[in-house]
């Protein structure tokens, strides 16, 4: 839910925002933003066919999830997946956006390399959970974006699911997945640490209901606004 909530935060700050769900094999943004029933339509411009993106909370969204049955396993080889992604990127009728957030799957595979080669990325934000096995993925991600042939600025790291605070014990923090692994790595390699996001029930409920918790939960909105302000300041 980080991408959806971050996008909505940027929108509440007055920016025009679009989201491209680049997680071809496991798209979720259309569900998180309440657009599951959207049926894409096409339009022509200058003799070229374009897809009209979904509109949700005054944001634009394009996802492969609009074109597949949610119960079907997507068994595409790498070339087929990357070609689909190129179409979603280049043949969507995006409006005049200030930010296009591209939600990528974990790892450093074909999807990431396709995005890097197809569009000039202004920066990468890497999301991790605190445990060491997750931080190992962060290490690979940072190294990929920093590679001399890639050279995409790493704007920072977000630590998601950082701790849990029960309502009945508001002064207690329980570090269920370990403590501060992503923060420690960010400090070690000189990458900005953008902030922590705790485990909050409203975030999970919002992901399921299609209503991001930003704008509903003031505590969650505060976490995301601090992160969004740091990202904007770095660009």
Where are these regions (language model features)?
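Short, hydrophobic alpha-helical segments
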Residues: 228-235
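Phosphate-binding loop that captures ATP/GTP phosphates
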Residues: 13-71
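Phosphate-binding/switch loop-helix module in NTP-utilizing enzymes
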Residues: 65-115
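C-terminal boundary of histidine-terminating zinc-finger modules
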Residues: 207-220
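Gly/Ala-rich phosphate-binding loop of Rossmann-like dinucleotide-binding domains
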Residues: 7, 11, 116
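Conserved catalytic-core segment of NTP-binding enzymes
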Residues: 94, 98-99, 105-196, 201-205
């Amino acid at each position: 839910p980080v991408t959806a909530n971050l996008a909505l935060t940027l929108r509440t700050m007055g920016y025009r925002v679009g989201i491209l769900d680049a997680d071809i094999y496991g798209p979720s943004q259309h569900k998180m933003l309440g657009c599951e029933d959207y049926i894409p339509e096409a339009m022509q411009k200058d003799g070229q066919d374009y897809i009209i993106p979904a509109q949700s909370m005054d944001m634009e969204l394009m996802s492969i999830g609009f074109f597949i049955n949610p119960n079907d396993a997507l068994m595409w080889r790498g070339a087929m997946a990357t070609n689909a992604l190129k179409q979603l990127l280049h043949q969507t009728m995006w409006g005049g956006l200030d930010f296009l957030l591209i939600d990528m799957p974990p790892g450093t595979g074909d999807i990431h390399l396709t995005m890097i080669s197809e569009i000039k990325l202004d920066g990468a934000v890497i999301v991790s959970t605190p445990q060491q096995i997750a931080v190992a993925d962060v290490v690979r991600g940072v190294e990929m974006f920093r590679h001399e042939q890639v050279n995409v600025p790493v704007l920072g790291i977000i630590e998601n699911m950082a701790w849990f605070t029960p309502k009945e014990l508001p002064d207690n923090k329980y570090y269920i997945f370990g403590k501060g692994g992503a923060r420690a790595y960010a400090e070690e390699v000189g990458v900005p640490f953008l902030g922590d996001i705790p485990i909050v029930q409203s975030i999970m409920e919002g992901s399921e209901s299609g209503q991001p918790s930003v704008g509903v939960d003031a505590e969650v909105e505060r976490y995301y606004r601090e992160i969004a302000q740091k990202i904007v300041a770095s660009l």
